[in-house]
Structures are given as structure tokens and as C-alpha cells.
């Protein structure tokens, strides 16, 4: 299956808020699901919706998600926690969490168009796995800095996770450590994703 490129708002209405997919929010009442049509959800549907939330939030294909689940299963610790840590340490997600891009697809585009340097080297792979002590900067070109500047200026100033620090004047971000589970920006039950 290829990456989802269809209407994003339909997915948000179905699955709830996905901050990585788009910055739009459903209006209270009219855009929400019809409350009169409350059908009991099967266990399969609950697990599928949790998996789809994860997929659409991080912009993954089915195969990429399966590969991350296999890697997380082989690692020490809780498979669900390790899975979320792997996804949070992707370069496109780090850019989104730093505020250098308004959405994860926007961060993917910045990386693909070679605007981002990791430790002084151009990285054009959005799924690049960042490590603690990595320094993420923009190219010295004016166009690259202008793109990042508009994103930083327009992004809502949410609390930055404790595993990241940003210097918005030098357009530089630093990864301090691997993310703690309480700082993950998506409300999800990762055990249901692993069980699926």
C-alpha cells in the first residue's frame, strides 16, 4: 500500500485529532461523527482504528509500520513503548516536534528537498533514525531559512518535549535523549497496535 494522499479531514473525523497529519480541527458538533448512530465497536475495529491512527499520524505505509513492529519486538522492553520511541525518533517527526514544520508531511517535504542537515551532513531520508546528541540544522541558503522561519513563527508555541531543545535564531535543534513515553504527542493505546 502506498502512502495516503487523500482527503485528510475525513481521516480526522473518523479517527479523532491527528496533529501530525494536519493542523485543522473539527468543529464542535457539525463535523463530529453522528452521536445518534452509536454502534458497538468490535474488538477488531478498535485495534484497527488504533493502528490507523498511528499510521496516518506518522505518515507510514503498512509495510513500514510492520517493519517497525518487528524491530520493536526484537528490542528489550515493552514492544509498544519501543515502537513509539522508534517512530518519535524519525527525522520528519523530530522536525515537526521542534516546530520547524507545521505537519509531518511538511517536514517530509523539507527533508526530501534537502533543506535539512544532521550533524553537518545533508540528509534527504525522512525516516532517518536520529540518535541522542544529534544536531539538526538548516542549510545556509536564504530559501531554506525562510521556510523554517515561517514555520517557527506560525507554529503554536506548545511546550517543547524534554528530549529536544531548539535555538530558533540559529535554526538549530538538538536531541538530548531518547523520548520519554509521557511526552508522546498522540493519545494512543500502543498495545492494541502491537496486538493487531
UniProtKB/Swiss-Prot annotation:
Similarity-based family: Belongs to the universal ribosomal protein uS4 family.
Any GO BP annotation: ribosomal small subunit biogenesis
Annotated S4 RNA-binding domain residues: 89-149
Chain's gene name: rps4
Presence of the UniProt keyword Transferase in the record: no
Function per UniProt: One of the primary rRNA binding proteins, it binds directly to 16S rRNA where it nucleates assembly of the body of the 30S subunit. With S5 and S12 plays an important role in translational accuracy.
Annotated compartments: Plastid, Chloroplast
Keywords from the named record: Chloroplast, Plastid, Ribonucleoprotein, Ribosomal protein, RNA-binding, rRNA-binding
Keyword Ribosomal protein among UniProt keywords: yes
Listed GO MF terms: rRNA binding; structural constituent of ribosome
Name used for this protein in its record: Small ribosomal subunit protein uS4c
Single GO cellular component term: small ribosomal subunit
Assembly and binders: Part of the 30S ribosomal subunit. Contacts protein S5. The interaction surface between S4 and S5 is involved in control of translational fidelity.
